[in-house]
């Protein structure tokens, strides 16, 4: 269950009449705190006014990002096993899902060799589902650096689904957005469902370059 100190704040907000429309991108106060959290924990910072948007859970953020970034026929690289919504989101956005099978002998991590083999001239986007659902696999910094080199070389974009970032125990989570040259080609997806036991509250967020977040906001609005 959601911890009581969070529920109490929700009750307080209802009692105070905080039930009206907000900015399309979410409460400014929340976006400022999201930026502080990402900067403090992962060394990456975003402009709360233009580079962060609050979404209806992480799933809406994934959907909006794909709709904003994909043209018809663009290929989306999706490592699997992974969250079941990536493929339908890509299809609904007009993209073509390309599955990269993650293997047990590699601890279900995405390898540079597997990534290179999947890239074609039509590849636009790579989904990075780490920490992974359902395998629990993580990508260490040294792993991410090799992936980032390939992403930059092929001028790809990344959707980094980091909803399980607080549920790592042996290695501290590293976001690929914090690596050299990756912030402006990565959309970081996260939220409060897993870290704060708030699955039913549907509270997520996306962070990334202003030009992409602005397009995602149009989709979020309409």
Task: Identify what each model region corresponds to.
Residues 1-57, 64:
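N-terminal small-domain helix-loop-helix segment of the aminotransferase-like
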Residues 46-52, 72-75, 122, 183-186:
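Short acidic capping loops at alpha-helix termini that bridge into adjacent secondary structure
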Residues 68-90:
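Conserved PLP-anchoring active-site segment centered on the Schiff-base-forming lysine
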Residues 74, 95, 151-157, 182-184:
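A short helix->loop->beta-strand "cap" motif at the edges of active sites that frequently abuts
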Residues 91-98:
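A short helix-loop-beta submotif of the ANL/AMP-binding
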Residues 98, 102-172:
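Active-site phosphate-binding strand-loop segment of PLP-dependent enzymes
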Residues 179-222:
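Conserved core segment of the aminotransferase class I/II
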